[in-house]
Amino acid sequence: MMMFHNCRINNYLITSQIGEGAYGLVYRALDIRTDRQYAIKAVVQSYGVSKEADMGNDKIHKNSVKLQKKLAKLFKESKNVVRVPSIDLESIENMSEEDFKKLPHYKEISLHLRVHHHKNIVTIHEVLQSAVCTFIVMDYYPTDLFTSIVDNRHFVTNGLLVKKVFLQICSALNYCHEHGIYHCDIKPENLLLDTEDNVFLCDFGLSTTSTYIKPNVCIGSSYYMPPERISFDGRVSSSKSGGHKLGKVCPSCNGDLWSLGIILINLTCIRNPWLKADKTEDNTYYYFTKDPNILKQILPLSDDFYSLLSKILQVNPKNRMSLQELMKEVSSITSFTNEGPLSKVPPLSKSVYEKFVSPVDNTNENLSPKSYVYMHDSKAAKNLSYTSSSEEEDGIKEGIDDDNGSRSGSFGTLDTDTGLHSSFTSTSCESDNECSKISNKFSLFEKKFNELRMSSSSLTN
């Protein structure tokens, strides 16, 4: 891994590399003007669209090294201070399908911008364009849900905390669906956490605006990918698991719902039920399609939780419960496991439920909806923490503070599959005048981008 010590991109000083994927690198950076931390994702300027996130580690590493070398050359030739233009975010947000044919790597950014106003979706602050890559400046958060579940055992002793985090994820995803965007890669690595255990959805690299997706089109990460996207022949093995012949397309939103079911198992049981929802490759999943009760044999599920999962993990996507129904049932459920701390979980009051699922932060009317931007700041975190009934608040904090970092209740372990990805989209204008403005903005942006590429072509060789 190449370290870019004392290297700057405009006013952002790179302090460390915190992630890598098939099409980009993620750095932690300090804004030297405000002394605030950000995450900067460096995305290669053009790549073939790969819909499956599970690219081999060797290929991911090879692509990362290639980009690192280009960045090293860029920093060297600019004496460690790269000055690049900031692209108008509104222009990117309103890019069309035709625009993406010219600049395919902007699809992910555009979709993300359309929903990043939700309080539980990572904010994009700037998009910077160089001849080597596009830099996306976003919120920085100290950890992700995978680390919190597996390494810190953070949720298995506190049912209220499970509800809080899961409902925030559902709220963010529901907001995306309402805006015609389907994430298609919901997994713990794409869910970040602040110091107050608020969760933030990120990485829209595989997202689509297509309401329906054809069966057997692999989009997502294997552990969380619904069966209809892996291997589907138009038949379902058992009527118990909701089986009947599917049509030629499957609802995109219901694929995200399946992923949420696996996430909820992760939060409560610290494991995945199977490695892949493919009858030919995974025996556990095969037996599940024959008899869904197998879940109660391999996981410590309460009857109520099993009943809920049976409505989510329907093999036929058209038979899955709605996201709104899922949110309501999670709010009212009184047990997740058949023993231990999660065997008794109080239902949420209406006010607390609404606070968790609200798309904006209503804890302080003087603060903007996205005041979560600086939640890594402990003072800001205290000012922005939610309020609830004393009993519920004490219940959440008790599970965080009382175990001094030592948490019990593990029933297995999750396997990691990380990566950065790529994407889809479309848009429309409400008037000819609006379309003209967007077209003019994009033309100027495209011209500037081409000038940058031509003047610095040696950097990409």
UniProtKB/Swiss-Prot annotation:
Pfam families: Pkinase (PF00069)
Keywords attached to this entry: ATP-binding, Cell cycle, Cytoplasm, Kinase, Nucleotide-binding, Serine/threonine-protein kinase, Transferase
UniProt keyword Ligase present: no
GO terms of biological process kind: G1/S transition of mitotic cell cycle; G2/M transition of mitotic cell cycle; regulation of protein localization
GO function terms (MF aspect): ATP binding; protein kinase activity; protein serine kinase activity; protein serine/threonine kinase activity
Chain positions covered by the region annotation Disordered: 384-433
E.C. numbers: 2.7.11.1
SUPFAM superfamilies: Protein kinase-like (PK-like)
SMART domains assigned: S_TKc
Residue stretches of biased makeup (Acidic residues): 390-403
Gene Ontology CC, one term: nucleus
Biased composition (Polar residues): 406-433
Active site: 185 (proton acceptor)
Domain Protein kinase per the UniProt entry, residue ranges: 12-337
Keyword Cytoplasm carried by entry: yes
Principal EC category: transferase
Reaction equations catalysed: L-seryl-[protein] + ATP = O-phospho-L-seryl-[protein] + ADP + H(+); L-threonyl-[protein] + ATP = O-phospho-L-threonyl-[protein] + ADP + H(+)
Subcellular localization, as worded in the UniProt entry: Cytoplasm
Amino-acid positions noted as binding ATP in the UniProt annotation, renumbered to this chain: 18-26, 41
Known function: Probable serine/threonine protein kinase involved in the G1-S transition.
Note: Present with 780 molecules/cell in log phase SD medium.
Family label: Belongs to the protein kinase superfamily. Ser/Thr protein kinase family.
UniProt protein name: Serine/threonine-protein kinase VHS1
Organism: Saccharomyces cerevisiae (strain ATCC 204508 / S288c) (Baker's yeast)
Gene name linked to the record: VHS1
